[in-house]
């Protein structure tokens, strides 16, 4: 159960009459609270209030600790199945040599082959900040020459202060 939601068990239930459901799904019908508690204790289980707003409130006879354990297991299993997206960043300067571009693109392609997202950033220095189009043009040129057809452009080149950034993701097969 979630931590924010308060759960009423056994004697904590204040309703005079309850619609009871057994652990196996069997419906006991509408019972007085004392009778429902008696049935739960006889079977060695807990009486758990499931729907307090219903008329009459719905309670289930079950092993509460076992139920909580199963809920935790489901949450852990769901967490395991989540895929963490790793983003690698490669920085360029606006006046980068072609040889250096080739070297950095080689690494970017390796990251994409490993199913990682790659953020390409052009760092603008000094007077280059006045003309961020240089960075946009460089990223577009890199995209056209190296990645088009091999990857997906998640974000177009955008200007973020001193940087011009573009996000490239592996192509979905």
From Swiss-Prot:
Magnesium in keyword set: no
Q: Name one Pfam family in it.
A: IF3_N
Q: SUPFAM superfamilies, per this entry?
A: Translation initiation factor IF3, C-terminal domain, Translation initiation factor IF3, N-terminal domain
Q: Which domain of life is it from?
A: Bacteria
* One of the GO biological process terms: ribosome disassembly
What InterPro entries does the database record attribute to this sequence? T_IF-3_C_sf (IPR036788), T_IF-3_N_sf (IPR036787), Translation_initiation_fac_3 (IPR001288), Translation_initiation_fac_3_C (IPR019815), Translation_initiation_fac_3_N (IPR019814)
Q: Name one GO molecular function term.
A: translation initiation factor activity
Keywords from the named record: Cytoplasm, Initiation factor, Protein biosynthesis
| Coarse class of the protein's main subcellular location | cytoplasm
Location of this chain's protein in the cell: Cytoplasm
State a GO cellular component annotated for this protein: membrane
> Does the record's keyword annotation contain Protein biosynthesis?
yes
The entry describes its oligomerization and partners as:
Monomer.
Family classification: Belongs to the IF-3 family.
PANTHER family, per the entry: TRANSLATION INITIATION FACTOR IF-3, TRANSLATION INITIATION FACTOR IF-3, MITOCHONDRIAL
Function of the molecule: IF-3 binds to the 30S ribosomal subunit and shifts the equilibrium between 70S ribosomes and their 50S and 30S subunits in favor of the free subunits, thus enhancing the availability of 30S subunits on which protein synthesis initiation begins.
What's the protein name? Answer: Translation initiation factor IF-3
UniProt organism field: Campylobacter hominis (strain ATCC BAA-381 / DSM 21671 / CCUG 45161 / LMG 19568 / NCTC 13146 / CH001A)
Give the organism's phylogenetic lineage: Bacteria, Pseudomonadati, Campylobacterota, Epsilonproteobacteria, Campylobacterales
């Amino acid at each position: 159960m979630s931590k924010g939601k308060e759960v009423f068990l056994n004697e904590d239930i204040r309703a005079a009459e309850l619609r009871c459901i057994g652990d196996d799904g069997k419906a006991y019908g509408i019972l007085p609270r004392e009778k429902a508690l008696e049935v739960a204790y006889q079977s060695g289980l807990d009486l758990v209030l499931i729907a307090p707003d219903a008329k009459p409130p719905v309670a289930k006879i079950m092993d509460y600790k076992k139920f909580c354990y199963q809920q935790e297991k489901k949450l852990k299993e769901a967490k395991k199945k989540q895929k963490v997206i790793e983003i690698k960043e490669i920085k360029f300067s606006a006046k980068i040599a072609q040889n250096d571009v080739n070297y950095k693109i080689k690494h970017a392609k390796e990251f994409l082959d490993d199913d990682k997202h790659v953020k390409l950033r052009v760092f603008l220095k000094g007077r280059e900040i006045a003309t961020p189009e240089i960075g946009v043009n460089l990223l577009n040129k890199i995209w056209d020459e190296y990645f088009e057809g091999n990857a997906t452009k998640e974000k177009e080149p955008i200007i973020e202060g001193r940087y011009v950034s573009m996000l490239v993701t592996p192509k979905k097969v």
